[in-house]
Every structure is written in C-alpha cells, then in structure tokens.
Amino acid sequence: MSLQAPHPSTPRMLRVAAAAHALAAVLLVVGRAGYGGRPRGLIGDMADNPWWALIHLAAAAALLASTHHPDARTWAAWLSAFTMTAWSVLLLWWAANLEPDGTWLAGTFGLIVAAISTTLATRED
C-alpha cells in the first residue's frame, strides 16, 4: 500500500471508465430489447451476447469500488481493459464482416476506454 496520495485525476478517470462500462451495458440491454440491429452469424452472436452486459456492470462496480479502495485499483483497471478490449475487438470484427454501421463507433469507443484503463492499471501514483 502506498502512503502517497493518488494523483487527483485518478479517481475521476476511474469514474469515467466505470461510466463507459455502464453505458456499454445499457446499450447491450437496449439492443437486445429490439431497438438496435439483430446480430447475424457467430461473430454477431458473440459481440451481442447478453452476458456482456453483466460483465460490463461487474467491471463498472469494480472500478467504482477502487476509487475508495486504492489497493484494488490495479486489478479493477486490468479487468476493465481486458473486458473492453475483448468486446471492442468482437464489435469491430462484426462490423468489418457483417454490419458496417454504428458498430464501428462503439468498437472504437471501447478501445479508447481500454487504453484509459490500461493507463490506470500501469500508473504509478
């Protein structure tokens, strides 16, 4: 445990990454309710699997908890980075092969959030 206080922007960045995961979960639920495009093929089924919503909510909860428990920040940020990277790669793969629409935007957004989470995981305060 570090006796040094974290950088002032660290809790804010953790909350932004948590909000991004919560938004991803909401988008997945709304899409499954019929407001978005239906997945086609194996890649689409993997990218739009309902378990992703729960995984994103778990990552968001871990990130929010780590704002109060700095010792948990590294593993929470790595969980966020791996989750968002895997989901984004599936989205981009889906968009490239099957459905080139707003899926590109969601996949790119996810990779940006994954980069933020990786920065948080490797940051020395």
Language model features with spans:
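Cytosolic juxtamembrane helix and N-cap/initiation of the first transmembrane helix
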Residues: M1-A24
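Mid-membrane cores of alpha-helical transmembrane segments in multi-pass membrane proteins
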Residues: A20, I55-A60, A77-V89, L105-V113
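Membrane-helix boundary connector in multi-pass membrane proteins
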Residues: P70-D71, W78-A106, A121-D125
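Alpha-helical transmembrane segments of multi-pass membrane proteins
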Residues: L23-G34
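Charged interaction scaffolds used for protein-protein
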Residues: L3, N97, I116-S117
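Membrane-water interface at the C-terminal end of transmembrane alpha helices
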Residues: L111-D125
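Juxtamembrane helix-break-helix junctions at the cytosolic face
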Residues: A61-W75
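A loop-to-helix transmembrane entry motif
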Residues: L14, P39-H56
